[in-house]
């Protein structure tokens, strides 16, 4: 029993406070940082407001310009499970001479006032046997050392699934955008070898591409490899109206 002289452990430790005058310290700091980040984000958005009047294509392949497709080769490859096979290696110049000759002379007349803005490597894959249920895989590299010798077969490690239409598309442009190549016909006429090495590969990457499947069996794949050139089209140098005054 407690008396007026007894020690009561609850004395001096009991108190009452109103929660509205107290806030969690962590919540205060987080709220301050959140407001600071919001102000910085709004200031950054204001600097980008002048760009709202411009339009860009989400997919550069579908952007402005004319797509000129040139089929390099078609062939059948057998791919074993859990492996990927090398299908494109630009260390050699196979398929280039015939393709570029046809491109320059027959398929598309290149003149001096036209530019190649971008080059896409397009690989279309189709199964040769019916009623097969699997997905295509692909991996590629663009910045390989010139002396690097790629393996013919590699194991599947973090591949990319091929998208719609079983088509794998790679932009070969350097520096994050198209690098215009002009005077193509004159450069090609002077020397084919110099044109490929000095003009084409100086502005675009040499790709290395592996393909495979997620099937548990060996599959036979029909490959169609092509280059798609994004040609910049200029307005014709001609009057808008034709008549006696022109």
UniProtKB/Swiss-Prot annotation:
Keywords: Viral occlusion body. InterPro entries: Polyhedrin. One of its GO terms (cellular component) is viral occlusion body. The keyword Disulfide bond does not apply. The keyword tRNA-binding does not apply. GO terms for molecular function: structural molecule activity. Major component of the virus occlusion bodies, which are large proteinaceous structures (polyhedra), that protect the virus from the outside environment for extended periods until they are ingested by insect larvae. Belongs to the polyhedrin family. This is Polyhedrin.
């Amino acid at each position: 029993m407690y008396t007026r002289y007894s020690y009561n452990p609850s004395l001096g430790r009991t108190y009452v406070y109103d929660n509205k005058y107290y806030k969690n310290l962590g919540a205060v700091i987080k709220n301050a940082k959140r407001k600071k980040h919001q102000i910085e984000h709004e200031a950054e958005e204001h600097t980008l407001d002048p760009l709202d009047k411009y339009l860009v294509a989400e997919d550069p392949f579908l952007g402005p310009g004319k797509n000129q497709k040139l089929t390099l080769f078609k062939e059948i490859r057998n791919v074993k499970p859990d492996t990927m096979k090398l299908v494109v290696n630009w260390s050699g110049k196979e398929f280039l001479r015939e393709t570029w000759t046809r491109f320059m002379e027959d398929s598309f007349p290149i003149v001096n006032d036209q530019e190649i803005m971008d080059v896409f490597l397009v690989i279309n894959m189709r199964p040769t046997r019916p009623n097969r249920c699997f997905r295509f895989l692909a991996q590629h590299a663009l910045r390989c050392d010139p002396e690097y010798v790629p393996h013919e077969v590699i194991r599947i490690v973090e591949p990319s699934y091929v998208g719609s239409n079983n088509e794998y598309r790679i932009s070969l442009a350097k520096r994050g955008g198209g690098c215009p190549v002009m005077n193509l016909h004159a450069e090609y006429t002077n020397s084919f070898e110099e044109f490929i090495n000095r003009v084409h590969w100086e502005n675009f990457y040499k790709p290395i591409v592996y393909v495979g499947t997620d099937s548990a069996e060996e599959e036979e794949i029909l490959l169609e490899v092509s280059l798609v050139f994004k040609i910049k089209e200029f307005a014709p140098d001609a009057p808008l109206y034709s008549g006696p005054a022109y």
